[in-house]
Design a protein with these regions (language model features):
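Residue-level recognition of alpha-helix initiation/capping sites
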Residues: 1, 14-15, 47, 190, ...
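Short Gly/charged-rich anion-binding patches and loops
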Residues: 4-5, 18, 51, 194, ...
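Generic structural marker for isolated residues within well-ordered, non-membrane alpha-helices
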Residues: 6, 20, 247
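Short glycine/proline-centered loop/turn elements that form peptide/ligand docking sites
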Residues: 9, 16-19, 211-214
Length: 292
């Protein structure tokens, strides 16, 4: 079973370490375990308990009252909140619990409930994109294993493909052609699949190439497919400082207007270029496509 330091827990549940220690001292709430050399740590059961405590606290329960409950009682109350699909904080905690436990059924149930209640676009905006950003940061810092990130990403990917297949593409007089791909060293397809979903809903044509497409291949594809736009999504933290260099390489080989989305676009200063349109969030994506 994985062991977590208090700084790991702080990052995972979004509560400061001194607050966690205050809960422990005042209420004996989820006291840490100790190694033979007296080093404090938390295990996966402790993490789940703390996530549930945060969920209740954010939904009106006082810590003093929660402290008097058993873990089973706390878990049952959180389960009652689970069907509050519009509550993004609860749903992110549900997804976190499921990912940590590799619980595919619970993860998929949460996804399905959110999408049914809010629709895919709102679910992506307020639940899934924030969740995946947090998971990516925790993976980079070692707070969770890469397998947790892959587990969550692949289930979201599978669900997006299902939602894309369900869309009945409307007929329009002037559909545009979009070339969707991820450049070299970018593997995360979630945002790109969501872009494909939006484009299909708007009645546009897409050629979806997936991840890590070599730069030289782009010229050949453009010559064959003749897209009106290229579309990439940049989220990998290891590309951060080189984000403008990556965009430049893509544009040099693409030679058509380029749309760029992803978390890196909102976190770094993107150089202004002709034929480049940064899309910083879901609202930007939707508005751009609606205006075409």
């Amino acid at each position: 079973m994985k062991k977590f330091s208090i700084s790991d827990i702080e990052n995972l549940i979004g509560i400061k370490a001194h607050t966690i220690r205050a809960w422990e001292i005042r209420y004996n709430l989820v006291p840490p375990k100790r190694t033979p050399t007296n080093i404090r740590y938390y295990d996966e059961d402790d993490l789940k308990a703390l996530l549930n405590i945060v969920a209740l606290n954010e939904n009106g329960y006082k810590i003093s009252k929660i402290a008097g409950m058993s873990r089973e009682r706390i878990s049952n109350l959180v389960k009652q909140l689970k069907t509050d699909w519009n509550n993004d904080s609860v749903q992110m905690i549900n997804l976190s619990n499921a990912a940590i436990a590799y619980d595919e059924e619970s993860f998929s149930e949460t996804l399905a409930g959110c999408i049914k209640e809010m629709g895919l676009t709102k679910t992506m905006d307020i639940v899934l994109f924030p969740f995946m950003k947090k998971v990516g940061m925790l993976w980079q810092t070692g707070a969770i294993d890469p397998s947790h990130e892959h587990f969550a990403s692949n289930l979201i990917r599978d669900r997006l493909i299902v939602e894309i297949d369900k869309v009945k593409k409307p007929k329009r007089k002037d559909p545009k052609r979009f070339l969707l791909f991820l450049p070299e060293k970018e593997m995360h397809e979630t945002g790109l699949l969501f872009a494909r979903y939006l484009l299909k809903k708007c009645g546009h044509e897409t050629l979806y190439l997936g991840s890590e497409i070599p730069y030289p291949d782009l010229k050949k594809v453009v010559e064959s497919y003749s897209p009106d736009y290229g579309f990439i999504v940049l989220t990998s933290l290891n590309l951060g400082k080189d984000v403008n260099k990556v965009i430049g390489k893509v544009m040099d080989n693409l030679n058509v207007p380029l749309l760029v989305a992803g978390s890196l676009i909102s976190e770094f200063d993107i150089l202004v270029k002709d034929q480049l349109t940064p899309l910083k969030n879901v609202c930007d994506m939707v508005e751009f496509l609606e205006d075409l």
